[in-house]
Amino acid sequence: MSESTLHVRYLGQQDYESVWHAMQEYTDNRDSSSPDQLWIVEHPPVFTQGQAGKSEHILNPGDIPVIQVDRGGQVTYHGPGQLVAYPLINIKRLKIGVRQLVTDIENSIVQMLENYQVKAYAKADAPGVYVDERKVASLGLRIRKGCSFHGLALNVDMDMSPFQRINPCGYAGLEMVQCKQLGGPQTVEEAGEQLVKTFSHNLGYQNLVHHQGLSQSYE
C-alpha cells in the first residue's frame, strides 16, 4: 500500500457508537500495510466525554445521550449540521508525532477557512480552531499502536443550543460559533470536500481513493 494514498470514506449520518466501534476495530486489526483513511460523517445529537472529562462540565444534558469514550479531551457535542472527520492515520509510518498530527489537522481547518476569507487560528494551550476567541472546531484524538483514531468536529450549519448544556471542552463560558455565521462553507458536504483537500495536502497524500459507506473490511 502506497504511503501517499489516502482512502476517504463518506458515511453520511451514522450513529456515534457504531462508528466509534468501527474505528476501534480498524485500528486494532490494521497492520503496517493497511491504508490510511479519513472518515467523513455526521452524527445524531450526542455528548461525548473524553478520558480526562469531568462530570461537572456536563450541566444539563436533558434528552441527549452522554457517552464516555476513549479519546483525549473533555466533553463536546455532536449533531446534524456538524462535519465530523476521523483520521485513521499510521503516524509511525508517516514519521510524525501526535503533536504534529494535531497541528496538521488544525492547519487544515485554518487553511480551509482562509479560502473563505475567514481568519481562524489554533491555540497552543487549547486544541481546536478559533475565530475571534469563539471556537469553530473541536479536536480529540487517541493513538493506539502508532495509529490515530477519533478526530475533529467542525460546526457548519447546526442547532448550537445543545452547547449551552455543557462547558464545551471543559471551559465554562466558551462561546461556540459555526461556519454559516462566519461566511465559511454553508453545508457539511461543502466543508467535507474542502477539508479533504487541505488535509490531504498537509499530510502529503498524493492519491485519494473515495468510498461511500463502510465495508466489512474497510478496504
UniProtKB/Swiss-Prot annotation:
Pathway: Protein modification; protein lipoylation via endogenous pathway; protein N(6)-(lipoyl)lysine from octanoyl-[acyl-carrier-protein]: step 1/2. Residues 32-207 form the BPL/LPL catalytic domain. Its EC number is 2.3.1.181. Substrate binds at R71, G72, G73, Q74, V75, T76, Y77, H78, S138, L139, G140, G151, L152, A153. The keyword Calcium does not apply. The record marks K135 as: Lowers pKa of active site Cys. Keywords: Acyltransferase, Cytoplasm, Transferase. GO terms for biological process: protein modification process. One of its GO terms (cellular component) is cytoplasm. Gene3D superfamilies: Bira Bifunctional Protein, Domain 2. It is found in: Cytoplasm. The active site is at C169. It catalyses: octanoyl-[ACP] + L-lysyl-[protein] = N(6)-octanoyl-L-lysyl-[protein] + holo-[ACP] + H(+). It is an enzyme of class 2 (transferase). CDD domains: LipB. GO terms for molecular function: lipoyl(octanoyl) transferase activity. Catalyzes the transfer of endogenously produced octanoic acid from octanoyl-acyl-carrier-protein onto the lipoyl domains of lipoate-dependent enzymes. Lipoyl-ACP can also act as a substrate although octanoyl-ACP is likely to be the physiological substrate. HAMAP family: LipB (MF_00013). In the reaction, the free carboxyl group of octanoic acid is attached via an amide linkage to the epsilon-amino group of a specific lysine residue of lipoyl domains of lipoate-dependent enzymes. Belongs to the LipB family. This is Octanoyltransferase. The lineage of its organism: Bacteria, Pseudomonadati, Pseudomonadota, Gammaproteobacteria, Alteromonadales.
